[in-house]
Regions:
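Core segments of small alpha/beta cavity-forming domains
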Residues: 26-68
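Surface-exposed, charged secondary-structure patches
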Residues: 72-108
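Short, flexible, mixed-charge glycine/proline-rich loop motifs
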Residues: 1-7
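Cysteine-centered loop/knuckle micro-motif
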Residues: 22-24
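Short, surface-exposed charged micro-motifs
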Residues: 11, 84, 112-114
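A short, polar/proline- and glycine-enriched secondary-structure boundary/capping micro-motif
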Residues: 34, 104-107, 133-137
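Short Cys/His-rich zinc-binding micro-motifs
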Residues: 8-18
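Short beta-strand edge/turn micro-motifs at domain boundaries
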Residues: 111-137
Length: 137
């Protein structure tokens, strides 16, 4: 059950229903690091919303991380829906939809994302074409 956001802290960008300070805010500020792939994905969405380039780079696998700059963060993100997630021991999958505004038109990004443990921390690796079987890997 999610905790409603209070007036003391705005609601989290990831649409969890929790206050930002008790959700992705602790990750974006460096106070903590997400311990699940879904929490990492939600925090990365919040980083895209707020333009937090250092956080995005830190949470992207070094083998697949592109060169990012502030021009890559101009999209106006509207909301996030986690469709489903599967947490493995070393690999995890999160499927989500993220809505954004393109001019006057609202569009949705639908992605199945691969996350892996790298140096004992979850990192985003890449989008996948379909749901793989990850078992306990």
């Amino acid at each position: 059950m999610s905790t409603p956001a209070t007036s003391a802290s705005p609601p989290c960008h990831c649409c969890s229903g929790k206050p930002l300070a008790q959700c992705c805010g602790i990750y974006l500020s460096g106070q903590a690091y997400p311990n699940t792939a879904e929490a990492l994905m939600r925090s990365r969405y919040s980083a895209f919303v707020t333009g937090n380039l250092p956080y995005l780079t830190k949470t992207w696998h070094p083998d697949t991380c592109p060169e990012l700059n502030s021009d890559d963060l101009t999209t106006r993100w509207q909301r996030l829906e986690v469709v489903k997630s599967k947490q493995g021991l070393k690999k995890s999958i999160v499927e989500f939809r993220a809505w954004f505004t393109d001019g006057d038109t609202e569009r949705a990004l639908h992605e199945i994302s691969l996350f892996k443990l790298h140096k004992k921390r979850w990192v985003y690796v890449e989008p996948l074409d379909k749901w793989p079987s990850i078992g306990a890997s």
